[in-house]
């Protein structure tokens, strides 16, 4: 599909500076990214917000997905998850996959698409992406119209800018109430980070939404 190929040039320059898929020797500074219209799941009033910067073709990003589900099982209804697109130039199908997922998000079907894409990381051709979108339940006509628009590319470019501002150096990178975690880490690392973040948030004297807004206002660094 030509629509995916023409989109690649739009964002390529924005993705080439990132250096790794997996782990990095340096953690980024504390940062609570603005959520805006990014896909979210979990309670809006959760004490803990986890922002994920990820690439749909990155094997480490796919590897950590079952662990994230385990976090929800271990700490039910305690985390609001937020996704930010970060397709790396080393992965030629990551950007088309992000565009496909963002167009599913327009129909409130981002998370079914997210699950499908990570379950089929070796099947991200144009035709496969359309099959995944159909499996996720999207209206295909509206989805195709979205693919031909600038909106998903603009969203991805904005997510990329947020990643640069946050000094993200690898995918996946997570910010747990602003505290960074990088890579496909063990379950215990995520649970410990969530527990510590929740305790600190509850001691703040603020409501959950107010607390995250306060973190955002501090900026990155």
Model-assigned labels for residue ranges:
Residues 2-3, 131-221:
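C-terminal cap of thioredoxin/glutaredoxin-like
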Residues 46-134, 138-139, 197, 204-221:
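Structural alpha/beta surface segment adjacent to cysteine/selenocysteine redox centers
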Residues 31-48, 73:
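A short beta-strand-turn-helix
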Residues 27-37, 208-211:
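N-terminal low-complexity, Pro/Thr/Ser-rich intrinsically disordered segments
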Residues 22-24:
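Bacterial signal peptide processing site
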Residues 17-20:
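C-terminal motif of bacterial Sec signal peptides marking the signal peptidase cleavage site
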Residues 1-10:
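Bacterial N-terminal signal peptides that target proteins for export
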């Amino acid at each position: 599909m030509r629509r995916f190929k023409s989109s690649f040039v739009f964002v390529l320059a924005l993705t080439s500076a990132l250096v790794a898929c997996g782990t990095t020797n340096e953690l980024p500074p504390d940062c609570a990214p603005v959520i805006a219209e990014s896909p979210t799941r979990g309670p809006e009033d959760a004490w803990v917000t986890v922002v994920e910067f990820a690439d749909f073709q990155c094997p480490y990003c796919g590897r950590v997905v079952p662990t994230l589900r385990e976090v929800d099982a271990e700490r039910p209804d305690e985390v609001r998850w937020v996704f930010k697109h970060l397709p790396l130039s080393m992965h030629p199908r990551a950007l088309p996959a992000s565009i496909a997922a963002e167009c599913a998000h327009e129909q409130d079907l981002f998370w079914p698409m997210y699950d499908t894409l990570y379950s089929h990381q070796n099947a991200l051709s144009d035709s496969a992406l359309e099959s995944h979108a159909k499996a996720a339940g999207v209206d295909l006509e509206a989805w195709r119209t979205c693919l031909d628009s600038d909106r998903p590319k603009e969203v991805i470019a904005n997510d990329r800018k947020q990643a640069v501002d946050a000094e993200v150096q690898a995918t996946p990178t997570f910010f747990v109430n602003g505290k960074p975690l990088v890579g496909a880490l063990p379950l215990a690392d995520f649970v410990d980070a969530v527990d510590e973040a929740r305790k600190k948030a509850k001691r703040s004297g603020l409501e959950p939404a107010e607390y995250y807004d306060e973190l955002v206002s501090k900026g990155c660094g």
